[in-house]
């Protein structure tokens, strides 16, 4: 019986790839709570802000808030991933990759919010614009494309991929 208890203790302490099961269970619990908080933030906090935005005279704040629902829902998940990197005893290359994944989530959240904000901004500007609808749609899509290209460039830079030679190799700025 004592050998069985020692076996259980050994499995608990070594766990999976040398990470104890307590840290793994804690990390999984934090991620689960983050997904629950994501729903809470989207349903409660955004709806409260929507009521406040509904009291204003303009519609642009309502539209931007609706556009930011999904990107703001990524914030708890990003924080949970960061906390998981602190809890788990990661070292070396695995720690570097985990840190880069958290940075990628931060960048993706920021650029997703920027990209989703473009449509309401263009909608607000379209009422006073002298541009045709086709040009406005083209400019809106071009702006979203540029935002995502910059976001992808930042993410590639996080993982150590040099962006300058890629852009120069394409011959875009010659």
Q: Where do the model's predicted regions map?
A:
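Short, strongly hydrophobic alpha-helical membrane anchors
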Residues: 1-21
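Hydrophobic alpha-helical transmembrane segments and their immediate juxtamembrane helical boundaries
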Residues: 22-174
């Amino acid at each position: 019986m004592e050998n069985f208890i020692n076996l259980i203790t050994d499995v608990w302490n070594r766990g999976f790839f040398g990470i104890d099961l307590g840290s793994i269970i804690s990390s999984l619990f934090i991620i689960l709570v983050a997904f629950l908080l994501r729903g809470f933030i989207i349903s409660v906090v955004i709806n409260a802000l929507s009521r406040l935005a509904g009291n204003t005279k303009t519609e642009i704040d309502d539209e931007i808030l609706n556009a930011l629902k999904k990107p703001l829902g990524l914030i708890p998940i990003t924080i949970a991933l960061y906390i998981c990197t602190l809890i788990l005893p990661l070292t070396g290359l695995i720690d570097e990759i985990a840190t880069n994944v958290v940075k990628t989530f931060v960048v993706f959240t920021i650029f997703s919010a920027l990209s989703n904000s473009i449509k309401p901004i263009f909608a607000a500007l379209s009422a006073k614009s002298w541009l045709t609808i086709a040009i406005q749609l083209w400019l809106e899509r071009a702006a979203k494309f540029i935002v995502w290209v910059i976001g992808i460039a930042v993410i590639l830079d996080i993982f150590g991929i040099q962006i300058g030679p890629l852009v120069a190799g394409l011959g875009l700025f010659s």
